[in-house]
UniProtKB/Swiss-Prot annotation:
It is an enzyme of class 2 (transferase). Its main location: Golgi. GO terms for molecular function: 4-galactosyl-N-acetylglucosaminide 3-alpha-L-fucosyltransferase activity; alpha-(1->3)-fucosyltransferase activity. Residues 1-20 are annotated as: Disordered. It is a single-pass type II membrane protein. Pathway: Protein modification; protein glycosylation. This is Alpha-(1,3)-fucosyltransferase 4. Catalyzes alpha(1->3) linkage of fucosyl moiety transferred from GDP-beta-L-fucose to N-acetyl glucosamine (GlcNAc) within type 2 lactosamine (LacNAc, Gal-beta(1->4)GlcNAc) glycan attached to N- or O-linked glycoproteins. Robustly fucosylates nonsialylated distal LacNAc unit of the polylactosamine chain to form Lewis X antigen (CD15), a glycan determinant known to mediate important cellular functions in development and immunity. It comes from the Eukaryota. Residues 1-54 are cytoplasmic. In adult, highest expression in spleen, testis, brain, lung, kidney and skeletal muscle and to a lesser extent in liver and heart. Keywords: Glycoprotein, Glycosyltransferase, Golgi apparatus, Inflammatory response, Membrane, Signal-anchor, Transferase, Transmembrane, Transmembrane helix.
Amino acid sequence: MAPAGRKLQHESRCRPSRPVDAWRAAATTRGRCMGTPGARRTARRGGWGLPRTSSGLAAAGLLCTALTACLCWGQLPPLPWASPAPQRPVSVLLWWEPFGGRGGHSKPPPDCSLRFNISGCRLLTDRAAYGEAQAVLFHHRDLVKGPPDWPPPWGAQERTDEALELRVFDDQEGAVMLAREALETTGSRPPGQRWVWMNFESPSHTPGLRGLAKDLFNWTLSYRTDSDIFVPYGFLYPRSHPAEQPSGLGPPLARKRGLVAWVVSHWNERQARVRYYHQLRRHVSVDVFGRAGPGQPVPAVGLLHTVARYKFYLAFENSQHVDYNTEKLWRNAFLAGAVPVLLGPDRANYEGFVPRGSFIHVDDFPSAASLAAYLLFLDRNVAVYRRYFHWRRSYAVHITSFWDEPWCQTCRAVQTSGDQPKSIHNLADWFQR
């Protein structure tokens, strides 16, 4: 999976700032090379490098396609079967495994070469290797739980909570100065070592940001496209062989017995998604699954096979923030073969990730009643409903593998970045804007 935008590891001018640019660029590559009016006129005139014969044109077209692929293949997310060039060896220390994974039940870190074709990557879990790591990865939700296991200099000599908090948290005036003094007295980071802040929750569910000291981290790793290491919950990539009827988990339309499904794990009446659900259910039947609210248990066949029996899936995020589209869209809807009904960031933001005809957005309708009327219309008009699946002929869905993929992408970022120093001056201002 490729980070996008201004990220250090992406310096090619061909690379897009958003995933949508990748699939749009792929869709237009043939037109730029072979189908433009200018190219056809040049061919008729016998211009430079374009033979007049049909066989010559075919050869020229293949050559043009190959050259374009060489120049701009970086636009597309690297596929699991791609063969990257050998990279310099890099060690990344996982200071915490997310959500308390460190301990007797934790699994060993992945082999990035086998999983993602990222060679030269060594993931470390032994904190004694702190001094040899080129990058140290911190998971925010674990970072803000408390100070006992913070890294040097905050964990080297000062062992009281009060002293450690003064070093890591900017809760009072002079904390940054004291942290810098601690760097001098208890040992600094190895030269060039990056501290990477990792978080995949929305700003609404990311406590403790305002307390973190300024200039503590060098890089950010998140779902945000403007992160230093951009790892979305999923993305689309071009099929190697476009198909009229691509195979997938979703059953044939005749087997879709239900209309609208929603799987929800946390129920909060104050959330926008719950309020909208109450309005929607007055006008159309919604089957709710999960352990929260009015949900019924997910059947034994599993979540994906359950959702696959429905025409629509409510991909309602727990909060609405830029770029925050999660497994509710990529896994629960797209992978299951249901049309997603989205409540999250605005439509324009979603269209930065997926084709506009692949989803329905609640903002497209003045009320929940009008959305319900449209869903019932699509239920009766099969041809119109099927249009929401046309994109599947050309694109497939990649689901991010947590947490292996973000870890390995950190290795790739270190390998391909330069040595220019950088720090995040105010993490809260960046993430909460």
